[in-house]
Amino acid sequence: MFFVEKYWENPQVLHVNTEKPHAYFIPYESEDKAKKGIRGNSKFYKSLNGQWKFKYYDTVSMVEDGFYACNYNANSWDDLIVPSNWQMHGYDKPHYTNVNYPYPCDPPFVPNDNPAGLFIRDFYVDKIDNKNVYLVFEGVDSCFYLWVNGTFVGYSQVSHMTSEFNIAQHLKPGNNRLAVMVLKWCDGSYLEDQDMWRMSGIFRDVYLLTREKVHISDIFIKTDLNENLTEGVLSCEITLSGGTSANICALLKDIHGDILSEQQANMVQQGILEFKVPSPELWNAETPNLYELYIYNGEEIILLKVGFRKIEIKDSVILINGKAVKLKGVNRHDSHPVLGHTIPLYHMKNDLILMKRHNINAIRTSHYPNDPRFLELCDELGFYVIDEADLETHGAERVGDFSMISRDPQFEAAYLDRMHRMVERDKNHASIIMWSLGNESGYGENHVKMALWAKNKDNSRLIHYEGAFSPSLYYDINTGWEATSCLDVYSRMYPSISWMADEFLQNENEKRPLVLCEYCHAMGNGPGDLKDYWDLIYKHPRLSGAFVWEWTDHSVLTKTSDGIEYYAYGGDFGDKPNDGNFCVDGLVYPDRTPHNGLLELKNIIAPVRTEAVDLNSGKIKVTNLYDFINLSHLVLNWKVEKDGEVIDSSEEDNIDLAPQSSSIFTLPYDIPQKPDGRYFLTVSYTLVTDMEWAEKGYEVAFEQFELPVGKVEKHPVTKASMPSISIVETNKEFIIQGSEFKYVFDRYYGCFTSIIYNGMNMISSMPKFNIWRAPTDNDRNIRNKWEAEGYNRLDTHIYSVKIISRDEKHISICSDFSLGGYIKKPVIRAKALWTVYGSGDILLETQAKVSEGIPFLPRYGLQLCMPKGNELIEYFGYGPHESYLDKRRSTFKSKFEATVDSMHENYLKPQENGSHYSTEWATVTNLLGMGLLFIGMEDFSFNVSHYTPEDITNASHPYKLIRRDETIINLDYKVSGVGSNSCGPELLPQYRLSESDINFKLRIKPIFKEDISLLDVVYSEITE
């Protein structure tokens, strides 16, 4: 082992020989190159990304001395791409833990067996020319030691922040060598206990910047606006490096590229240039207007894009440029299924474009600063950003003192350093509206000092930190102002809607605006309570917005031993401790395919609201929910459908509606005089022209209304008009035979064993009543109660089966039964009345009594299986994707066609999926159109799959699901909502199946679709 100072366990030594933190910028040699902003085009910039030599050690104690020497032979080492995480390349293993530290909680000490990665990179320097050469690391996890040409240069930590070294004195013309030792853990790891995959290495870009001895080292842009926002002042504070004077010129261009003003000054060490801007075009997330400030010093040209905007709180409301805004946000981690924490620029932009396409206007950089170029994109595309310090000590909660590190004086410097480095690097970005002190670290004096330093440095932004407001630990809403007075907003995670309405808004002692920095945990099939939150947020100005947890499923793309690709989560690599699939909690899949939850969010936070005024006369109310722009960029499209077929449509292209205003529009459709079908009006809003984030015609929002036509009067099918049936009774069964069918009903089990129509058996096993669903991720808490009550292990007990009535045209059989699990009393006692008619129709009427004092039911309905080949689905209900009682705002009611496979949502952890709320009828057929038609006497929930609920319950990953040939159909009276209880409040009562008495009627009819008019059957009813 070689000797090196043990900085990694010394919180008093955070950096050795690093440059002072400063604003991010890249100098260029021409205005054109500066404007394009491709840093590789700058002659002052040299990327060191690429292939490095790499050697991994399980413990730093095994590292041999001399690896950093110029003549060291590293040819036997492996090659590793930088930037990367070494765990993504087979060294060590990815490790997911949410709260728990993966080592004993004994700060500042980390395990003796501390894994180390050694990196060597040779590079060529033509000449030095008495210049400064800065080596920049934009992200290294967790800490690193640096040597250049065999000489120790320095040390640094803070994984998600820039570390910069002036290495000019260590360079020589020709070949040079960098050697870096990265350690998996350091004392700073106690401050980086974020809910994420734990990965190590040089994971962000590495590059050289060559600068003159006297050069601009820092720039601080401040914009000020007068009270009525008609006059702006841009202040540019410039800091020089090199100790002598420099002639600085600055040129300001407006958003159209026209020159507004030019300033020039001779500066010594520091100086300020000011620009007065009359009638500035302001920056906001809807119109992200950016001015261009070119700063010239010698050969260097630096371009900073400047946004004029004013952030303030008045009357307990967050204002941007004097307007109350709603933050429609998400929490975003750096996560890539193949690259880990290494995020290419195009991937950042794709994320942001996808957010814009789904009406998201705000981002919390949970829980660390992002790549600086990410913030440039936020400036340009238009997002409100909460920039969060690289700080979380959640694991301290496990040892009984959540705030122990936040109160510990030996970590004060580390806390301040993380705030310092973030603010200094990111201070010039218009998109940043709040500085966040970190996440889930208790609350202590170290936080207060961070906040006070940031306010002193930059009073133009708000200070955020949620951890101070935990009601059980630190904050009394009645007396807590003094302890948290350094915080500008009241922030909470996952509060219930009732807490927001009945406690926060009613408390007269708390005047700050409320921001939900996390809510609606988007894990798996969910979230299901978005609409309820946003109804309340829109209603109250003090409720300033909310950030969904979280943007993407964190997962590692890997393979099984036999080569099947799958997305891994905690524990799949043998990592301990782990939190399983709790990292799979995003609005998008790891490959950024949207979950249905993202579509739900899009329509709920849409910037246009449509309400019915008088649908008989075509009157609707349109409200512009944008804060700054009118609706001239949108077209209002409308269509009227009858039974799922469009019968009328048009568009209104003149909806130039001012922000936060409403207007009545009259749509020229006709209402039929007689109710001869199901009529629905759909209003949607699409882009007039191409935008940077979406194409012309892209739908921004929609709303659907059922037209007041009245209930369709069904035509009668009399029993007398039907063919006769014969009934044969045996000790075991009832055999019911008609002209085209033969049904066999088991007297012992109380249900059909075959439904044969035209010689084809329509079922492959006996139908059964069911209450179980494969638990969703958001059922993780209620699941324990369900299983304790036996919902997952139901047996059906038949008390009696008897014929209630019969004649030559029909037979009615009543089955008395119960559903229950072992140990517990039955969950349900019920009667099922099965009536078979000469037409082949089966009418099911079930009356169920739910046991008292038990948890609400996951579902209640009939499950049946159809044989192989029944793959084609047609239904009239909410689609085209899955819909639930509390998760349906991204769906609409119409007629849809699908296949069984297409109706399965392949969540990374298998769970309940693919149900369709408020279905009126559905068919499941083979390729010839032969199959079953299901008609609800009242709307029902409909689901088809090649997996049973038990199959899905027992599978940990999709590849473990064994696809059945048969088609499993669930026809449910109701399915409980999905909510967001994996981390949020319990499912709201109105979305629970909690009825004590259930009445459910369903008509089942074998069909050959070519031989019938489907709607004629749907709009018929059997009468005496």
Enumerate the language-model features and the residues they cover.
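Short strand-edge motifs at loop-to-beta-strand transitions and within beta-strands
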Residues: 119-121, 161-165, 269-275, 663-667, ...
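Beta-strand/loop-rich accessory regions of lumenal/periplasmic or secreted enzymes
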Residues: 88-90, 139, 184, 284, ...
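Extended substrate-binding grooves/exosites of carbohydrate-active enzymes
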Residues: 2-38, 89, 97, 151, ...
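Short glycine/proline/serine/threonine-rich loop/turn segments at secondary-structure transition edges
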Residues: 131, 171-175, 276-290, 673-680
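Intrinsically disordered, low-complexity Pro/Gly/Ser/Thr-rich segments with frequent PxxP/GP/PP motifs
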Residues: 264-279, 644-676, 685
